[in-house]
Amino acid sequence: MIITTTPTIDGHQITEYKGLVFGEVVSGANFIRDFFASITDVIGGRSGAYESKLNSARQEALAELEKEAKRVGANAVVGVSMEYQSMGGDKGMFIVVATGTAVVIR
C-alpha cells in the first residue's frame, strides 16, 4: 500500500475516494525513562528513550491508518498528516494521530 503526504501519486490515477481514515495511538512513558530524560534535558542532550518511544508510536499510527484503509477497500492513502499531542498532564502520556484520504489507484 502506498501512503504519502502528497495529494496525488506520480504514475497512478486515483479512481475512487473512500474517505478519511485515521490511525491513533496513545502511549505513555515510565518513571525511569522520565527521570533519565530530565537529566538529558538539563545537560542539553537528546533523549534517545523518548525519541524511540515517539518513533514506535508514529509507526503504530501509520500501521493503524493502513489497516483502516484496507478495511474500506483502498489500496493507497494520500494527503497524510501526523499530529502529536501531550495529554494526561504530568503523567507523560501522548497521542499520535495519522490522518489521510483512503483511495483506490491504478
UniProtKB/Swiss-Prot annotation:
Protein name (database record): UPF0145 protein APL_0465
Q: Which family does it belong to?
A: Belongs to the UPF0145 family.
Coiled-coil region list = none
Q: Which HAMAP family match?
A: UPF0145
Species name for this entry? Answer: Actinobacillus pleuropneumoniae serotype 5b (strain L20)
Mark the transmembrane ranges.
Answer: none
